[in-house]
Amino acid sequence: MSDRECDVCGKEFTKKAGLLKHKQRKNPCKAPVRLIEATVHQTLVDAGVPHLEVPTTEFREVSKKFNSSMSKELRKEQGIFFTPKKVRDVLFEKLAECGVNPKVILEPSFGSGEFLLDAKRLYPEATLYGVEKNEELFASTQCPEANLVCCDFLDWKGKADLIIGNPPYFVLKTDHLSAKEKKVFASKNAEAMTGRPNIFILFLYKCLTEHLEEDGYLAFIIPTSLYNCSYYQPMRNYIQKHTTIKYVETLDKPGFYETGQDTMLIVLQKGKRNNDYIFQSASGNIYISPHYKELYDITKGTRTLADLGLGAKTGNVVWNQVKEHLAEEGTLLIYSSNINHSELKIDNLCGKERKQYVKDMKKPTLSGPLILVERGYGNSFSFNSVLVELEEFYAENHINVIYPKTEEAAENLNVVMRSFQDERSQKFVKWFIGNGSISATDLETIIPIF
């Protein structure tokens, strides 16, 4: 080890002064997973206890074999995506930094057992429980030290002081939910979410409310839609009131087996201690972000659309539900693809079935001046907008429409367009949006106007 390398975390510095500052910081570093692994491994060897091998690749063979034998469609349908070692390591490192030493560990959807095997290696004295619904995965998992159950996690009962894993994520069909699940996940006053119920929210809510011991830790890999999706506002409210967020990070896309999903790491401790990683808007809405401090700083002293007398709503035409009205001429229908860097590009359509005009539509038309903003499709988000002064047109549902609530407020549309082109607006959107789209409510009440 060099004289400029930290003897705890292994980080190397170019100057001794940097190392000294690192050691004297308020929150001292702790041993990362690779050092914990080595310590546990050596302890077991010294004691003559059989030990588990430390994996040297991102996925164990059982994960690779199962992934190659299962169709992409089925994996997507059941939300089965295995977690690479480098991602698992980060979660375990963060738990180590928190001083977690669990007695009982639960993985609620253990898949091929990657997390269970890591947990057994890192916490050899802990009791392990694993639940898996898929019978093939259950049969293939090689972790005899764990108490494994093949069942639907929604039916499982038990307690743990550490819950860890990568729960499935896919949209549930409401007609498949039980009466209890509909109350929690599909009702207007849902305790966990509104709108379309996603299985990962169901797992998260059940773990926090039924299984996690007081002061216990939950460490999950879940979609970034938890950051700001309006459907999950109740879940964020619960997290803010009943837990402490210890760590949040957005993951880079590569690593998972074809998930096509932006994901995040989150570590929660049951019990309220502080508001780290929480961004609360002036209207009281709760959001989660690794950039919460930057969001507070950038919005300080700014106004919103609502402050300027402007409102926002979503376009009222779903094009594939009005195919019989699509035409080569008639009333203009503006799609999100028509919005291109503050300009309206007519005939810039995606897909052969779409047409730029509609006929015989009974829906009310829009009339300018209005600002049209691309709402997003749930992937990467581009903050595109255009000022439109046409007298009669429609906007599809992937567009948010900014409108003046009074004649006097119409003058502020130009102020908003200038603000949207400010680089600070792009920064805010990058830090704030986790699900690849922005709601009309967020546009009206949160996006800062510079």
Please provide the spans of the model-predicted regions:
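Signature of N6-adenine DNA methyltransferases within the class I
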Residues: K76-F92, K103, S109-A126, V131-E145, ...
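Polybasic, glycine- and aromatic-enriched phosphate-binding surface used to engage nucleic acids
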Residues: I298-F450
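Glycine- and acidic
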Residues: K72-E77, N189-A190, E396-Y403
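Flexible, charged surface loops at secondary-structure boundaries
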Residues: E97-K103, R121, D155-K159, H325-E328, ...
